[in-house]
Amino acid sequence: MNMFSAFNINASGMTAQRYRMDIISENVANAQSTRTDDGTPYRRKVVAFAEKGGNTAFATALNSAIGYKGMGFSGSGVKVTGVYKDYKTQMKMVYDPSHPDADEDGYVLYPNVDIITEMTNMIDASRAYEANATAFNASKSMVARALELGQS
């Protein structure tokens, strides 16, 4: 494991959380969008993450340190595997016969975006980003100190 692995791991976490915050912002912005380009209401989007592989030296050290015998950890950070539309959560039906998108019974189909859930997810993503940034700065301080020791 080289000294820049920690930077790469933390940077991947910050990038993933920033992307997650972008998608959450899009959900909040479209919470009242009853018609998209395809004529249907906006559907909430969710970001999926996966562990990056490849850092076997770190993984071996970590897994032996914790006594793990299974698959273990690769220790190379995180990556975004995709953005998926949420088809599990139902759309909201609201009676509003004056709305231009109302059906023949006067109901309007609204997006399946819950603002409270999205704001909670935004706080979670923000704190995860902040934790990665703090770890990044700690790694930077350790490398700077190691360089100072190497010069003495």
What are these regions (language model features)?
Residues 1-152:
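Amphipathic alpha-helical polymerization modules
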